[in-house]
Design a protein with these regions (language model features):
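NAD(P)+-binding Rossmann beta1-loop-alpha1 motif at the extreme N-terminus of oxidoreductases
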Residues: 1-55, 59-62, 190-191
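NAD(P)-dependent Rossmann-like dehydrogenase/reductase catalytic/cofactor-binding core
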Residues: 2, 204, 208-274
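Short acidic capping loops at alpha-helix termini that bridge into adjacent secondary structure
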Residues: 29-32, 89-91, 197
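Rossmann-like NAD(P)(H) cofactor-binding subdomain of soluble oxidoreductases
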Residues: 39, 48-49, 53, 57-132
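Internal alpha-helical scaffold of NAD(P)-dependent oxidoreductase catalytic cores
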Residues: 104-113, 129-167, 179-216
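A short glycine-threonine-serine/GTX helix/turn-capping micro-motif
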Residues: 167-176, 225
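Catalytic, metal-anchored helix/loop core of enzyme active sites in primary metabolism
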Residues: 170, 182, 271
Length: 274
């Protein structure tokens, strides 16, 4: 499909990752407009990407096919107050705000197509994964627009909206789990006598390569782990410690806490709107 023109409201880490990804994917700067809160930030982004910007969200969204909301969840109600009456039914809202349900946008803006999305930070290097779900008025065209935009920074999975809090907890938060594991492995390597530089190179490539095995071989994690776990070997000794000390339960508890917090953020945004 033809590139939809895009307004990005909120150009923090994720918003900027999307802008950069779209430009790499052959969008032109003239096809993007950016909404910022500070003049200095707008000028910085214009110098870097050549896109127009404004402090006024109404000006930013005017005439754009898709409006990406990439502000913090608690900022959504105020943004919707500013946009009330400013959007047309042929525009699509693509919300990246964690926990904020499509109904909140629909109640504020009317019968406008809303697609809720949860990306993750590997989008910075075009290796992201995003779960998306349609609101009540988001038909095929709106979902196609969301697809083509988000595919510029990685993969896209279509889901029902009630699954997106789980997506937030698994893939949205997931990079932090991987980074924490990397931190722990690096520190453990240093305690075993390796230099930090060597430890970082070993750990970073090991995590990258393990992810590639999962993606490219089609084998599941259990099978891949079994392949490197010989009875009585070094990997078996390590797995015994991790399993015995509740590694799985810790991960499950962490995911549950993140999903719960996603729901809480959505509830808080609804209370502010009311």
């Amino acid at each position: 499909m033809t590139h939809p023109t895009v307004a990005v409201l909120g150009v923090g880490a994720m918003g900027e990752a999307l802008v950069a990804g779209l430009l790499r994917a052959s969008w032109q700067p003239s096809e993007l407009s950016l909404g910022v809160r500070r003049t200095e930030r707008g000028e910085e982004l214009h110098d870097r990407y050549g896109c127009s910007w404004s402090l006024d969200p109404v000006e930013v969204v005017n005439g754009r096919d898709v409006v990406v909301v990439a502000v913090k969840p608690q900022s959504v109600p105020h943004l919707l107050e500013q946009l009330t009456g400013a959007m047309q039914q042929n525009q699509t809202v693509l919300s990246l705000a964690a926990g904020v349900v499509t109904r909140l946008y629909e109640d504020a803006l009317g019968d406008i197509p809303v697609v809720r999305a949860m990306p993750n930070t590997p989008a910075l290097v075009d290796e992201g994964i995003t779960g998306i779900a349609p609101g009540r008025f988001a038909a095929e065209q709106a979902m196609e627009q969301a697809d083509v935009i988000l595919q510029a920074v990685g993969g896209v999975i279509h889901l029902a909206e009630h699954h997106l809090d789980a997506v937030t907890a698994v893939s949205g938060t997931g990079p932090a789990y991987a980074f924490l594991l990397a931190e722990a492995l690096i520190e453990a390597a240093i305690r075993e006598g390796l230099s930090r530089g060597v430890a970082e190179r070993l750990v970073n490539q090991t995590i990258k390569g393990s992810g590639a095995l999962l993606v490219e071989t089609g084998k599941g994690p259990f099978e891949l782990r079994a392949q490197v776990t010989s009875p009585g070997g070094t990997t078996a000794a390590a797995m015994h410690i991790l399993e015995g000390r509740g590694f799985r339960a810790l991960v499950e508890d962490a995911v549950a806490a993140a999903a719960r917090r996603s729901r809480e953020l959505g509830e808080a945004a609804r209370r502010v709107e009311e």
